[in-house]
Amino acid sequence: ATNFNPEINLREVSAPGSYWEDGHWVEIPAMSIKREYNFEGVGMKDMYLLHHEEIEALAANIPHVKRIRFFMTFGQSYLTHMKCLENVGMLRTDPVEFNGQEIVPIQFLKALLPDPASLGPRTVGKTNIGCIFTGIKDGKEKKVYIYNVCDHQECYREVGSQAISYTTGVPAMIGTMLVAKGLWNKPGVFTTDEFDPDP
């Protein structure tokens, strides 16, 4: 089972990865760049480079940024199951005929998998979501790691969901609150990184 929308999660993981470097997009085969990283509060994990929509907005809104990459961790069991599903065609996104009707295999699979919201009471452990920044400050190379650690069970007690939904929903709720209060207010459609972070 996935801890977020299964269709979106499986599409992200099985799709080619990409990252922004030197003013253009670089595409790589799915899951082809893997790093081992020691995450604060979580420990050593394998992380894989994926394409994610956040990096599109960051590349567009941070002038002169040299490189932006997005990594996500996955256990070997998850990856093995995903590869089996891919091998038998269950991650296909094109319609196929089945018993006289058209179905999209990945959408059918989503209907069979548990609703991620139902997994909150039994999800244990912690998440670590962060950004590693490297660059030059005052003529010297500098590296900064900003991160957030959330405990699945603490999140569930607070809002009735596991930490993945919590860390997705809370920033969106804060942004909505800032718009409702008029602190973030300009005509058009914008991503959060285009607004004042300290209203």
Give the ranges of each region predicted by the language model.
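C-terminal catalytic/substrate-binding lobe primarily of soluble NAD(P)-dependent oxidoreductases
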Residues: 1-199
